[in-house]
Amino acid sequence: MENTNEITMEMLQKQVDALTKKVGKLEKNRKDQLAIAVVSGDLDKVLAAMVISLAAAAMDTQVKLFFSFWSLSALRDPKKHPKGKDFISKMFGIMLPTGKDKLTLSNMNMGGMGPMMIKMLMKKQNVMSLDEMFKQAGELGVEITICEMSMGLMGFKAEEMIDYPHLRYAGAATFVADAGESAMQLFI
């Protein structure tokens, strides 16, 4: 019986040592970086992503945002109207908000009154607007990646996206790589 316990303890110690080594390797490869997958196109959730991003960037943490699916509406420039879209792409363009100013709330949207009230409160309390947050994020070096697959599925084109200094187009594998090397990951 004692021999079995010794073998078991020895096996456990080897497993603990292997895990300790693996965790050490993972921690060593982590950067002071925040990766956020922004999937929701709701005003309150895009605001949350930007507030967290700005806070992290102000603390010298590298920030990488990955905009996918419904959140792409926030990155559409209402002044840009690309040509050559098929019927379904045009319909998505009509049905979805065009730009940050047209986003709705996830709760209490109240036919558009909710976003107006939030924006009024933000202004009254000297909170930056979403446009100002994106401008500051650009100045702080926050990177935004637009999911190419989502963009294609929803019929959006690169020509209709906002002008942003650190904007790139890539797939989900890019976000997985960014998240894998980040000390913090969020999904909004």
What is the predicted function of each stretch?
Residues 117, 123-149, 166:
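Ligand-binding beta-strand-loop-alpha-helix segment within the catalytic cores
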Residues 36-47, 75-78, 121-125:
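Short, glycine-rich nucleotide/cofactor-binding loops
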Residues 47-65:
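Histidine-anchored nucleotide/phosphate-binding helix
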Residues 83-122, 126-129:
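A glycine-rich helix N-cap at a beta->alpha junction
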Residues 122, 146, 151, 159-188:
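Glycine-rich, aromatic-bearing surface loops/beta-hairpins
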Residues 72-84:
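N-terminal beta-loop-helix "entrance" segment that forms/cooperates
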Residues 63-69, 145-148:
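Short internal beta-strands
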Residues 1-33:
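Long, leucine- and charge-enriched amphipathic alpha-helices
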